[in-house]
Swiss-Prot record:
Its main location: cytoplasm. It comes from Magnetococcus marinus (strain ATCC BAA-1437 / JCM 17883 / MC-1). PROSITE patterns: AA_TRNA_LIGASE_II_ALA (PS50860). It is an enzyme of class 6 (ligase). InterPro entries: aa-tRNA-synth_II/BPL/LPL, Ala-tRNA-lgiase_IIc, Ala-tRNA-ligase_IIc_anticod-bd, Ala-tRNA-synth_IIc_core, Ala-tRNA-synth_IIc_N, Ala-tRNA_ligase, Ala_tRNA_ligase_euk/bac, DHHA1_dom. This is Alanine--tRNA ligase. Pfam families: DHHA1, tRNA-synt_2c, tRNA_SAD. Keywords: Aminoacyl-tRNA synthetase, ATP-binding, Cytoplasm, Ligase, Metal-binding, Nucleotide-binding, Protein biosynthesis, RNA-binding, tRNA-binding, Zinc. The gene is alaS.
Length: 878
């Protein structure tokens, strides 16, 4: 049974048993800063398990894309060397959210494994947590497994928790026994790490809530989280003891072998490891890029870069000196594109990003390997490579630490992890800051109970800018109150509202809340702390508002309209960027206000003027077409199937709002124009870098764009008036002005040179003799730095033999020293003289034996410095 068939059978089986099929979520977790990547099937359901979100199903089934290559789950160093370690894998899972529990979960899992997949029950054994008598009884009494096939595990291996606190519970796992021809012992034994017994199914019984003191309190509605690795099931069903021998990997291994000119069936063990590494890594690399991650030196992008460069290095071990990984994208698309259409839809982008990174690393790989060879030349087995060298390899040659460790592994040379970490401290602190928590816990303590009590806020703002409502909650200083009085700053929650709460990058509405008694609350901001709760922040201007009061809510219409224009323009610009730059472009963040729009997007280099102009032209073309904005509500799956862009980092419920403006179609809950022509005109203000692999565009449209154009036009008119020309001939006028300036500068240089020549004769009269050598150390005025240098040359020529130091004051000190050829480097060096003189005026300098330059900041010290020069020269002459 091939991998695709197993996946289809799994989903179909649980659909037949009342489970809703939920598509795989992105590898980039939404609204979870604690995770780099989605690493388990339950990640997309975390809010359901925590009780923060409700959906219209209580049973779900999914085949989830997962990556484990950083943080707690870091399988990278073992990939390719063991039978079952992967950076990318698929987790098949069935879930119950307060629906069925242990008995049905065990029964369904056992039935699917033994009946639908046809795995021999005699080959299976299970584990339970040692204190979970309920699960043990179900397995032995209801399923009918003999006691020697149910192993009690006392360790935390069979007790799962989401974190230090929160939902947790015991686990039960199903293991497949490959037989005594494969080394290894059963789970719980000393040699359990062997390959004979492989876990193919894990049932997590979430039945407790762990408090901060460790107390376990039974959950009112226990849940089920099940995980089964597709790659492991494929190995069992295809009679393989190694996942890489299944149909999920073999086409990729053979394609890589063909590129390297080796036979994967007869090659050496180390060559086979390299082929397996490449097959695994092209999967994770391609899926990560397809989900919007680009190579960088921080966060997710850095993990991607590590994986890519490890794959490239193994290609080099196979003799692949030129970029090759990008050529495997086609094979991967043919293998998995039917299930994951993003692989085929983005194949050109995937290949381009991978090849660009391959070329970038190839430029330093050879030099870096040579540096590494030199560094380990004197090391023996058991020695450790120092952290400074490791950091140099990382910082200069782009070698991630684990890549260097992987290279040294075969030589049995270790790495100085602590030393490397010390060198990396500053960079790591920056990366860690990017993954710090979001501070949502304190908000949850206030808003979750409030939402439970008052219910969802109904949003009326798509149609109305004013509405009547009831006040259902009041907040002051972070706590609920009964009333707000004049002068109080606080928050108002109503049962319904036309005010848009900030979300999806769109700022919240402003306006007023008026009460029948004349009281007035000014809304300065509107937030959406939870998906169904809208909170109006502001200040009580007059009167008092009480819980239960009837209120009239009025949005600031002019501000709302300006925000509408910019939000719709953001959609059009996002679509234009993908058309101009490529489908790898994905929104990484946005900010839409009445003043302007800002869009952060994934792209690996700065945009050219031609690209910026093309994007601007496309958006303005869509505006001129004056098409209607269309809105529809559908499931996320239906929306994506229809071609809508889902923005990763946004959380979507069971139904989503799809906004179409011309060719642009996105999942969006924001407010938009009725027709594209309402935006008037669009103008890009700036393009810049935000972080590695992320660019930022700022733009305006409508009235704001017209105001900027008007301001620019007025500035052009004013500049043209100064030059006494027309605005359309301003460039010519500036060219003429610059030409005149250049001519004047040349004339000034000639005058200064002539002046300097005249000054030289006077300076020569100030020369003195020190130890039989002529010395001229004086301050000059009225010249620039260039003239000062010319004067030193002229003095040297006329002096014949001697030492010169000229000082120029002003805002700072400029110094030039000269020594004639007969003395330079023999008895006196200009560089030494400059070091002495510059230090005395609070600066530094240096140069050749015959000429040196320098300067300082202490202008007042010039006379003292000049007085000290004869003594310095006498010391030099001895």
């Amino acid at each position: 049974m091939n991998g695709n068939e197993i996946r289809k059978r799994f989903v179909a089986f649980f659909q037949q048993h009342g489970h809703t099929h939920v598509e795989s979520s992105s590898l980039v977790p939404r609204n979870d800063p604690t995770l780099l990547f989605t690493n388990a099937g339950m990640v997309q359901f975390k809010s359901l398990f925590l009780g923060e979100e409700r959906r219209d199903y209580s049973r779900a089934v999914s085949a989830q894309k997962c990556v484990r290559a950083g943080g707690k789950h870091n399988d990278l160093e073992n990939v390719g060397r063991t039978a079952r370690h992967h950076t990318f894998f698929e987790m098949l899972g069935n879930f119950s959210f307060g629906d069925y529990f242990k008995e049905e979960a065990i029964r369904l899992g056992w039935r699917f494994v033994t009946e639908d997949l046809g795995i021999d029950a005699q080959r299976l054994l299970v584990t339970v947590y040692s204190e979970d008598d309920e699960a043990y009884a179900i397995w032995t009494q209801q399923i009918g497994l003999p006691a020697d096939k149910v192993i009690r595990i006392p360790t935390t291996d069979n007790f799962w928790s989401m974190g230090d606190t929160g939902p947790c519970g015991p686990c039960s796992e199903i293991f497949y026994d490959y037989g005594d021809t494969v080394a290894g012992g059963p789970p719980g034994s000393e040699d359990e790490d062997g390959d004979r017994f492989v876990e193919i199914w894990n049932l997590v019984f979430m039945q407790y809530d762990r408090s901060s003191d460790g107390t376990l309190t039974p959950l009112p509605k226990p849940s089920i989280d099940t995980g089964a690795g597709l790659e492991r099931l494929a190995s069992v069903l295809q009679g393989k003891t190694n996942n890489y021998d299944t149909d999920l990997f073999q086409p990729l291994i053979k394609a890589a072998a063909a590129l390297a000119g080796v036979d994967d069936t007869t090659c050496s063990a180390e060559q086979l490891v390299s082929l397996r590494v490449i097959a695994d890594h092209i999967r994770s690399v391609s899926f990560l890029i397809a989900d919007g991650v680009l190579p960088s030196n921080e966060g997710r992008g850095y993990v991607l870069r590590r994986i890519m460069r490890r794959g490239m290095r193994h290609g080099r071990l196979l003799g692949l000196e030129q970029p090759f990984m990008h050529k495997l994208v086609e094979t991967l698309g043919a293998l998995m594109g039917d299930t994951y259409p993003e692989l085929t839809a983005q194949r050109k982008t995937l290949a381009m990003v991978i090849e660009t990174e391959e070329k970038r690393f190839a430029a330093t790989l050879g030099t870096g390997l040579k540096h590494l060879e030199e560094a380990v030349a004197g090391l023996r087995m058991g020695d450790v490579l120092d952290g400074k060298t490791l950091f140099t390899l990382y910082d200069t040659f782009g070698f991630p630490l684990d890549l260097t460790a992987d290279i040294l592994r075969d030589r049995e040379i270790g790495v100085d992890q602590e030393g490397f970490s010390a060198c990396m401290k500053e960079q790591r602190e920056r990366a860690r800051a990017a993954w710090s928590g979001s501070g949502e816990a304190s908000l949850g303590a206030l808003y979750h109970p409030l939402l439970e009590r008052v219910g969802a806020s109904e949003f009326l703002g798509y149609v109305h800018e004013s509405a009547s409502a009831s006040v259902v909650a009041l907040i002051k200083n972070g706590a609920e109150v009964e009333s707000l009085t004049a002068g109080d700053e606080g928050s108002v929650v109503c049962n319904q509202t036309p005010f848009y709460g900030e979300s999806g990058g769109q700022v919240g509405d402003r306006g007023v809340i008026q009460l029948a008694n004349g009281a007035r609350f000014t809304v300065t901001d509107t937030q959406k702390p939870l998906p169904d709760l809208i909170v109006h922040h502001g200040k009580m201007v007059t009167g008092t508002v009480h819980l239960g009061d009837h209120a009239e809510l009025q949005v600031d219409g002019a501000t709302r309209q300006a925000i509408r224009l910019h939000h719709s323009a953001t959609h059009l610009m996002h679509h234009a960027l993908r058309a101009v730059l490529g489908e790898h472009v994905k929104q990484a963040g946005s900010h839409v206000s009445a003043e302007r729009l800002r869009l952060d997007f994934s792209h690996f280099q700065g945009m050219s003027e031609e690209e910026l102009r093309a994007v601007e032209d496309r958006v303005n073309g869509a505006i001129l077409s004056n098409v209607s904005q269309e809105t529809a509500v559908m499931t996320p799956q239906e929306a994506v199937a229809a071609g809508a862009m889902a923005l990763f980092g946004e959380k979507y419920g069971d139904e989503v709002r799809v906004v179409r403006i011309g060719d642009s179609m996105e999942l969006c809950g924001g407010t938009h124009v009725s027709r594209s022509g309402d935006m008037g005109i669009f103008h890009i203000l700036s393009e810049s870098a935000v972080a590695a692999g992320v660019r930022r565009l700022e733009a305006v449209c409508g009235g704001r764009a017209r105001a900027i154009f008007r301001g620019d036009q007025e500035a052009l008119k004013a500049a043209a008036a100064l030059l006494k020309t027309q605005p359309n001939k301003l460039a010519e006028g500036i060219e003429r002005l610059l030409g005149k300036q250049k001519e004047l500068e040349k004339s000034l240089e000639k005058l200064q040179s002539a002046q300097a020549g005249g000054m030289v004769e006077a300076l020569l009269e100030q020369a003195v003799e020190v130890g039989g050598i002529k010395l001229l150390a004086v301050e000059v005025k009225g010249v620039d730095g260039k003239a000062l240098r010319e004067m030193v040359d002229q003095v040297k020529d006329k002096l014949g033999s001697g030492v010169i130091l000229l000082a120029l004051g002003g805002d700072k000190v400029s110094l030039v020293a000269g020594v004639t050829k007969d003395l330079a480097g023999k008895r006196v060096k200009a560089g030494d003289l400059m070091a002495f003189a510059a230090a005395m005026v609070g600066g530094k300098g240096g140069g050749r034996p015959d000429m040196a330059q320098g300067g300082g900041t202490e202008v007042a010290a010039i006379p003292t410095m000049l007085t000290a020069i004869p003594g310095w020269l006498q010391e030099q002459l001895g």
